[in-house]
Design a protein with these regions (language model features):
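Conserved AMP-binding/adenylation subdomain of ANL enzymes
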Residues: 24-44, 51-152, 162, 187
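Generic beta-strand/beta-sheet core signal
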Residues: 3, 16-19, 48, 73, ...
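Conserved AMP-binding/adenylate-forming
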Residues: 91, 147-190
Length: 190
């Protein structure tokens, strides 16, 4: 077993035991899913959580299993410039990171007017429909094609252009946030 120190977010600071069986089970499940996503591409992780964090501790084993190249962000403030350098295929973080990302994107989207606003609304609506495995009609397919080029591709490029998945762990991700990020072209797993 491994004992990880926690800061006591929900109480007093304490050591928490993670069993080797639990760690391996998490790693095997993650490896299977991530290998299917990255296929033959090299696994490139950009990480910023402290290495002592229980989620990051497990992620390190997954990185080894995948033979991944790992970049460590200099700081949260330098995350976007570090993304541009690393061009990650996988980014792992806790739900709070994705909540903050959602808020920033949502605020930016809400400032848009006219055609841009309509395009963003279509991107979210059609992306959600795709996520729910609902068929798009011919008109929706054409609109979705333009949403992919004009909105989703630009968003993906903000994260290095090679991102296959955000992986949220260490707590529950709000379903609404996961659906939103997926709908705008940022594949998000939990």
């Amino acid at each position: 077993a491994c004992i990880i120190y926690t800061s006591g977010t929900t109480g007093n600071p304490k050591g928490v035991m993670l069993s080797h069986g639990g760690i391996l089970s998490n790693c095997e499940g993650a490896q299977e899913i991530l290998k299917s996503l990255i296929k033959k591409d090299p696994a490139v992780f950009l990480t910023w959580l402290p290495l002592s964090h229980s989620y990051e501790h497990t992620v390190q084993y997954v990185q080894i299993l995948l033979g991944a190249k790992v970049f460590y962000a200099e700081s949260l403030e330098k995350l976007l410039p570090n993304v541009a350098i690393a061009k990650p295929t996988i980014m792992t973080a806790v739900p709070r990171f994705y909540q903050n990302l959602y808020s920033k994107i949502f605020i930016n989207f809400s400032k848009q007017k006219g055609f841009k606003k309509k395009l963003i609304e279509s991107t979210i609506m059609l992306g959600t429909k795709n996520l729910d495995k609902k068929k798009l009609n011919f008109k929706e397919k054409i609109i979705n094609f333009f949403c992919e080029i004009l909105v989703r591709r630009k968003i993906k490029n903000q994260f290095g252009g090679k991102l296959k998945a955000f992986v949220s762990g260490g707590g529950a991700l709000d379903q609404k946030i996961g659906e939103f990020l997926n709908s705008i072209g940022l594949p998000t797993l939990q």
